[in-house]
Amino acid sequence: MKKIGITGGIGAGKSLICEVFQLLGIPNYPADFRAKWLQSNDPELKAKIAFHFGKEAYFENGELNRSYLSKEVFGDDEKLNLLNRLVHPAVADDFNNWCTQHADKPYVLKEAALLFETGSYKQLDATINVHANQDLRLKRTLERDPDRSEENVLSIMKKQFSDEERIDLADFIIYNDESRSVIKQVMELHEKLLQ
């Protein structure tokens, strides 16, 4: 079974593309969602986070105090890197366990916004970048997440690799720019990945 990473900047349409692959019977591991889940549910990871960031990192009911943790790491690269060093190995283990449950599939997808930035793409067989220009991604994100400000979205974009960097690193590109059929692109790529 091949392990294929799928990434793209915020608002590029990664989840939409993954849904098309799922219609073809290809399972998708949503790494960003699982990272959040693990931070609230994995006892070992919770203990590490509480040790490094204080007991305030969790509410009394055991749920992650996202706003506290966000304030702790926002603007502090050292703390953010520490959090990533705690979370990413847990996600990698979770992904590998998930893969064993899907060993009968020709390939699986690992959807992650920071696939290249974290280096996790190096453990995969190939990568797909979902591409859309920055203006379109900004528009989509503001429509999808009305609580976000334009400044907030642009700040997230600045922390992600540029379109050019992602394109250079990716093995395959799917253009989700409203000028080409994503279904046709996914179908063609699916055929290649089955070989």
Predicted feature residues:
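Walker A (P-loop) phosphate-binding motif
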Residues: M1-F33
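A general structural signal for well-ordered alpha-helical segments in protein cores
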Residues: K3, C18, K46, R66-S67, ...
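Residue-level signal for inorganic ion chemistry
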Residues: G13, D32, L83, L109, ...
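Well-ordered beta-strand positions
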Residues: P27, F33, A126, D171-F172
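ATP-dependent small-molecule kinase phosphotransfer cores
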Residues: F33-P106
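Short gly/ser/thr-rich secondary-structure transition/capping motifs
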Residues: P89-D93, V108-A113, L154-K159
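ATP-dependent NMP and nucleoside kinases share a basic, alpha-helical "lid"
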Residues: D94-Q101, Y107-L142
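Small-molecule kinase domains that catalyze NTP-dependent phosphoryl transfer to phosphate-bearing small molecules
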Residues: K122-Q123, Q134, R144-K192
